[in-house]
Curated annotation (Swiss-Prot):
Source domain of life: Eukaryota
A family per Pfam: FERM_M
Native species: Xenopus laevis
Main location: other
UniProt cross-references to InterPro entries, sorted A to Z: Band_41_domain, FADK_N, FAK1-like_FERM_C, FAK1/PYK2_FERM_C, FERM/acyl-CoA-bd_prot_sf, FERM_2, FERM_central, FERM_domain
General function of this protein: Non-receptor protein-tyrosine kinase implicated in signaling pathways involved in cell motility, proliferation and apoptosis. Activated by tyrosine-phosphorylation in response to either integrin clustering induced by cell adhesion or antibody cross-linking, or via G-protein coupled receptor (GPCR) occupancy by ligands such as bombesin or lysophosphatidic acid, or via LDL receptor occupancy.
Protein name: Focal adhesion kinase 1
Domain FERM: 35-355
GO terms for cellular component: ciliary basal body; cytoplasm; focal adhesion; plasma membrane
Domain Protein kinase: 435-693
Length: 1068
């Protein structure tokens, strides 16, 4: 086999002096002529399928076998014997299958005389199929994918418009499933996903034009969604096999048929069928069964020639073992006979495992014989430059769970040629003797990273970081390694790691500026307890400026994560690791085709469709901000890469980090919008982060001032100091951005109230200090801390007090005798302990707010009395005593006018309003007694009690219960409700007609309550094992509580109707 090698970076026109972009090419002997052959194939790459090709240099001694070998070697193909090379004329149906032993130069001389070179197309195809080829190809993934692409292309170009609509839909949906293996089965139900498929990818890639033109867009969308569901659970390989299974009855891709005649004359017209299962067979008509002629193992020799008559037909003779005479086949032309001979010869070589041809070609007088095939020297073998190196091999030495292989094809991306090349990198070339290699400080994708010193004329001892490449003897690995440097050389930004230079000779080095504090993730973990919130927001802001700069340069980074950010100083971080960065020439998006990618950081469209844009970088930046706020915790801990997209599709997002300002988390959630068009751009993120950072700095300064004031506050043991206590600062005002939906951060809202002083009671005219200094502050924080901000007895600071001088313990001692002072302190201590016990008791009886809008009111004496507090919570039988939160015990000497305040301003209600919903626990439903009626044989009362008991039982069991137990619990509540409603239906006839309407409304309300409970149960089951599960469990409890309350309301309505009967029956 003569030497040939790949050069994917050559332009597609033949050239005699073309060079590799990052290498000078293979050494050639003087006088040798090398040309380039462009060969199209079906190895999937980054470009459109019509452009999948490789450029191969060849010399005078290169044969077809050498061309095939070089292409398949670069893809690690096992079934090399199945491949053949086809030459076809673009403007006619002329096709030639090229025998492996023929020289490429001879072929070009022969055929390019009849047509120009640009009209010929060289195409690598799988032609020779082994028996059971599907099973055999499943062990050779590149060959399986190649054959699938070949068959799919033939189907789309030849018969797709003639097949049944159902088959076309199935085959198209199988191709979608295969192409986007990470996509969830229900992903196309989302409008944004379908639009990506329809507009960005294009439906014509999957479905024939006849189908797209004949079906309305809305109908087509429903058909695609319905059909896709059938194959939702298939993986890539299963999709391919299913494709073959559906297609085989309508298109025989596993055999070739030729119209010819058996014998040396046109006596028997047949269709000769050649394939792995049939061997060599023929059919006399379409409906007949094939007649077997011979197996490939029986063929001994093959000869072909042209007839000597005026028609110049092709004659094919096969010598069959055991046959008395050769099998003669007459073909319409010599070309067809030659193609048949090549096909049978390929099968014979495949089944016998021989490399020698079975074709006998007698040399005619004057015909130039092919030169002998020189053996490939060992040094040439090692010098051959493969087309590409599998990315999985590159990552094998440094593989982590952060990255996962998402597809099976290769990435043939190359940077824009106008700015990339070693010729232009000359300015960055550094002499190796100027670099002093130091200790290893980390590991990279291609090799180790070392600390070192660069002796430059400007700086004789510059500390640098040096990336080394372990296996850069291969030009393709060397090119990929240098690609990061050639990307970085375009950037000049204070928060992007700067490229110092490169050494392109082996061993290849990339020299960059050294960030002494290392990776941001490790830095955050080590400094977790010393970094404040402002520093974390500062890092996020600095990264946003770097990414806004990349966005303006039309680059996508594709690997934004804390591990790829370096810390230059405690207040400066820099974005690094541009190994996955890509330039978007068309300013739309970049589609990845191979590589290990960080799934847990990626946007859904990147996982589903391998689609990378600035918007997908925004998603990753949101995840990176979350990492920073979590001090280096990785996202989706404990979740498999394959499960991440499912959680995102279900609406799950990373939770808000502790101490994260709501404004910042709101910004993160905007970055995680499922629809890429709804995500902010980096310029917007930069501006908003700048505002959030300034607000945090102001709040930090305010907290520091507060802290300093607390430190200088007059202590009880002031040592005789007469200085007055500091005047408290003014209450905080809302942020000017609050109108845009920004709120104070939770850690600030939960800070102790600095405007309040723990007080002591009033006696003998001494003002009480138990109140709030500034009552107005309660209006700002009432929903968070309304107990602390309840209306005070007497305002703490009054003008008269400011003028009266200090009021410390020494002044009190002058007013009160010593024994009274001690008594006062003891009483205060007792009151504090009493308050603590009361608060703990209050928490135990804490309940969610009773809905006041449920429509049930009590008609007492003709007045409408709205429910308040716990009046409408039913008390079950067996607990006759009213069990409600106890009133706070009065303090000795404390004024009692608080009891006259409205219910909604009471301390108890205010305290309950401030309780976090996640602190709500299953509770007793304990209402006050109902109407004073005789309950003997009262079926309604008994069934209401039974329903409430069922709700209580469900509430107590729901938290630890697995999802499969939800249905029996809810079913128990439903049965109790059905019994109650049946009893009410029996009771209605004896009640006044004027009350029927109200009773029926109460019944309908109970039915809607049960429907709501069932709906929440379904959601809790659907989102099991996600962060939303607990939320829906709480909503189940709320719905159950509402059902119990409304059942009690129904009983109240019936009791009121009964009281009307009693009142009318009494004599006036």
């Amino acid at each position: 086999m003569a030497a040939a090698y790949l050069d994917p970076n050559l332009n597609h026109n033949p050239s005699t002096n073309a060079k590799s972009r990052l290498s000078t090419g293979m050494e050639r002997s003087p006088g040798a002529i090398e040309r380039v052959l462009r060969v199209f194939h079906y190895f999937e790459s980054n470009n459109e399928p019509a452009t999948w090709s490789s450029n191969i240099r060849h010399g005078d001694a290169t044969d077809v076998r050498g061309i095939i070998q070089k292409i398949v070697d670069s893809h690690k193909v096992k079934n090399v014997a199945s491949y053949g090379l086809r030459l076809s004329h673009l403007h006619s149906e002329e096709v030639h299958w090229l025998h492996p032993d023929i020289g490429v130069s001879h072929i070009r001389e022969k055929y390019e005389q009849s047509h120009p070179p640009e009209e010929w197309k060289y195409e690598l195809r799988i032609r020779y199929l082994p028996k059971g080829f599907v099973n055999q190809f499943t062990e050779d993934k590149p060959t399986l994918n190649f054959f699938y692409q070949q068959v799919k292309n033939d189907y789309m170009s030849e018969i797709a418009d003639q097949v049944d609509q159902e088959i076309a839909l199935k085959l198209g949906c199988l191709e979608i499933r295969r192409s986007y293996g990470e996509m969830r089965g229900n992903a196309l139900e989302k409008k944004s996903n379908y639009e990506v498929l329809e507009k960005d990818v294009g439906l014509k890639r999957f479905f024939p034009k006849s189908l797209l033109d004949s079906v309305k867009a809305k109908t087509l969308r429903k058909l695609i969604q319905q059909t896709f569901r059938q194959f939702a659970n298939l993986n890539r390989e299963e999709s391919i096999l299913k494709f073959f299974e559906i297609l085989s009855p309508v298109y025989r891709y596993d055999k070739e048929c030729f119209k010819c005649a058996l014998g040396s004359s046109w006596i028997i017209s047949v269709e000769l069928a050649i394939g792995p299962e049939e061997g060599i067979s023929y059919l006399t008509d379409k409906g007949s069964n094939p007649t077997h002629l011979a197996d490939f193992t029986q063929v001994q020799t093959i000869q072909y020639s042209s007839s000597e008559d005026k028609d110049r037909k092709g004659m094919l003779q096969l010598k069959i073992a055991g046959a008395p005479e050769p099998l003669t086949v007459t073909a319409p032309s010599l070309t067809i006979a030659e193609n048949m001979a090549d096909l049978i010869d390929g099968y014979c070589r495949l089944v016998s495992g021989a490399s020698e041809s079975f074709i006998i070609r007698p040399q005619k007088e004057g015909e130039r014989a092919l030169p002998s095939i020189p053996k490939l020297a060992n040094n040439e073998k090692h010098g051959v430059r493969p087309h590409a190196v599998s990315v999985s091999d590159e990552f094998s030495g440094d593989e982590t769970d952060d990255y996962a292989e998402i597809i099976d094809e290769e990435d043939t991306y190359t940077m824009p040629s106008k700015s990339y090349g070693l010729d232009e990198a000359g300015d960055y070339e550094i002499q190796r003797d100027r670099i002093e290699l130091g200790r290893c400080i980390g590991e990279g994708q291609f090799g180790d990273v070392h600390q070192g010193v660069y002796m430059s004329p400007e700086n004789p001892a510059m500390a640098v970081a040096i990336k080394t490449c372990k296996n850069c003897t291969s030009d393709s690995v060397r090119e990929k390694f240098l690609q990061e440097a050639l990307t970085m050389r375009q950037f000049d930004h204070p928060h992007i790691v700067k490229l110092i230079g490169v050494i392109t000779e082996n061993p290849v080095w990339i020299i960059m500026e050294l960030c002494t504090l290392g990776e941001l993730r490790s830095f955050l973990q080590v400094r977790k307890y010393s970094l404040d919130l402002a520093s974390l927001i500062l890092y996020s802001y600095q990264l946003s400026t770097a990414l806004a700069y990349l966005e303006s340069k039309r680059f996508v980074h594709r690997d934004i994560a804390a591990r790829n950010v370096l810390v230059s100083s405690s207040d400066c971080v820099k974005l690094g690791d541009f190994g996955l960065s890509r330039y978007m020439e068309d300013s739309t998006y970049y589609k990845a085709s191979k590589g290990k990618l960080p799934i847990k950081w990626m946007a859904p469209e990147s996982i589903n469709f391998r689609r990378f844009t600035s918007a997908s970088d925004v998603w990753m930046f949101g995840v990176c901000m979350w990492e920073i706020l979590m001090y280096g915790v990785k996202p989706f801990q404990g979740v498999k890469n394959n499960d991440v997209i499912g959680r995102i599709e279900n609406g799950e997002r990373l939770p808000m980090p502790p101490n994260c300002p709501p404004t910042l988390y709101s910004l993160m959630t905007k970055c995680w919008a499922y629809d890429p068009s709804r995500r902010p751009r980096f310029t917007e993120l930069k501006a908003q982060l700048s505002t959030i950072l300034e607000e945090e700095k102001l709040q930090q300064e305010e907290r520091m001032r507060m802290e300093s004031r607390r430190q200088v506050t007059v202590s009880w043991d002031s040592g005789g100091s007469d200085e007055a206590p500091p005047k408290p600062s003014r209450p905080g005002y809302p942020s000017p951005r609050s109108s845009e939906g920004f709120f104070p951060s939770p850690q600030h809202m939960m800070q102790p109230n600095h405007y309040q002083v723990s007080g002591f009671s009033v006696a003998h005219g001494i003002p009480s200090m138990s109140g709030n200094m500034y009552p107005g502050q309660a209006s700002v924080l009432d929903h968070m801390d309304s107990w602390n901000h309840r209306t005070p007895d007497i305002n703490m600071w009054q003008p008269s007090m400011e003028d009266s001088g200090p009021m410390d313990m020494r002044s009190l001692a002058q007013v009160l005798p010593t024994h009274l002072m001690e008594e006062r302190l003891i009483r205060q201590q007792q009151e504090m302990e009493e308050d603590q016990r009361w608060l703990e008791k209050e928490e135990r009886f804490l309940k969610p707010d009773v809905r006041l809008s449920r429509g049930s009111v009590d008609h007492v004496d003709g007045n409408i009395q709205c429910p308040a507090g716990n009046q409408h919570i039913y008390q079950p039988v067996g607990k006759p005593d009213h069990v409600a939160p106890p009133k706070k015990p009065p303090r000795p000497g404390a004024p009692s006018h608080l009891g006259n305040l409205p219910a909604h301003n009471s301390p108890v209600d205010g305290y309950n309003e401030g309780v976090k919903p996640w602190r709500i626990q299953p509770q007793e439903i304990s209402p006050p007694p109902t109407a004073n009626l005789d309950r003997t044989n009262d079926k309604v009362y008994e069934n209401v009690t039974g329903l409430v008991k069922a709700v209580i039982e469900m509430s107590s069991r729901i938290q630890p219960a697995p999802p499969e137990e939800y249905v029996p619990m809810v079913k128990g509540v439903g049965l109790a409700l059905r019994t109650l409603l049946a009893t009410v239906d029996e009771t209605i006839p004896v009640l006044p007609a004027s009350t029927h309407r109200e009773i029926e409304m109460a019944q309908k309300l109970l039915n809607s309550d049960l429907a709501e409970l069932i709906n929440k149960m379904k959601l809790a089951q659907q989102y099991v094992m996600t962060s939303l599960q607990q939320e829906y469990k709480k909503q189940m409890l709320t719905a159950a509580h509402a059902l119990a309350v409304d059942a009690k309301n129904l009983l109240d309505v019936i009791d009121q109707a009964r009281l009307k009967i009693i009142s009318h029956s009494r004599p006036h």
